Design a protein with these regions (language model features):
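General beta-strand structural signal in soluble alpha/beta enzymes
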Residues: 4-6, 85, 116-119, 147, ...
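N-terminal glycine-rich anion-binding loop in soluble enzyme alpha/beta folds
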Residues: 3-62
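Short, glycine/acidic-enriched loop or turn micro-motifs at the edges of active sites
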Residues: 10, 122, 208
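Single conserved hydrophobic/aromatic residue that forms the stacking wall/gate
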Residues: 201-209
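Glycine-rich phosphate- or other oxyanion-binding loops that anchor nucleotides, phosphorylated ligands
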Residues: 54-57, 63-92, 97-101, 148
């Protein structure tokens, strides 16, 4: 048995994670650069999207602190339970680095602690499935070591395929270049967007009918 921990990039709601004994470490969100909210703990996904649509607010995210991870790890470390921590791709966030630093700090005082931090190479929907697979292996009785091996092998294969009415938020967030947004807008196109290996690609799509 092992403890499963994930940052909130997996898009699980807090209640679902608690029901399935998965600890969430929140990323932070700000709309004004001054007030930061812990995702799922101080602002729900519904509130997040309502601010974007009703207030036309553009969010920015920040990684969990090292202390956030220390606080999440310590109960299991003190109980002698191995930990698997799944983190958003390092291409989008420094969450993995915070978790690794927290692990290294803890191991100085608890050298026998078993803490594996995984750079999932995923985000959002594919990260959700990654954590779900880890949970299923835990519940099926897979060992800590076997689960780590299988998760490491899964990392390169996640994909997200989606489309959206507007590319504005992806452009503002630096995920797509402005030229692509301008062209698709003028031609009234909704491109198919693929996230693969931490990068976004666009595929040709029919015009919006």
């Amino acid at each position: 048995m092992f403890k499963l921990i994930s940052d909130t990039s997996c898009d699980w709601i807090k209640e679902y994670a608690e029901e399935h004994n998965v600890t969430l470490v929140p990323l932070y969100t700000t709309f004004d650069g001054q007030t930061y909210y812990k995702e799922q703990f101080e602002i729900s996904y519904d509130e997040f999207y309502r601010k974007m649509t009703d207030e036309n607010a553009f969010p920015k995210s920040s990684l969990p602190s090292i202390q956030d991870y220390v606080d999440a790890f310590m109960p299991s470390v003190e109980a002698g339970v191995p930990i698997i921590c799944c983190c958003i791709t390092t291409y989008f966030s420094g969450s993995y680095n915070s978790a690794c630093t927290a692990r290294d700090m803890i191991i100085e005082d608890y050298p026998d602690a078993k803490i594996t931090v995984i750079n999932s190479l995923q985000n959002s929907a594919s990260m959700s499935l990654f954590v779900y697979e880890a949970m299923c292996m835990r519940d099926a009785g897979y060992s800590y070591e076997d689960t780590v091996k299988k998760l490491e092998a899964m990392r390169p294969f996640g994909r997200i395929i989606f489309t959206t009415e507007s590319l504005d938020y992806l452009t503002k967030g630096g995920r797509l270049v402005k030229t692509a947004t301008m062209i698709t807008s003028k031609l009234n196109l909704r491109p198919i967007i693929i996230m693969k290996g931490c990068l976004l690609y666009t595929s040709p799509s029919p015009r919006d009918a």
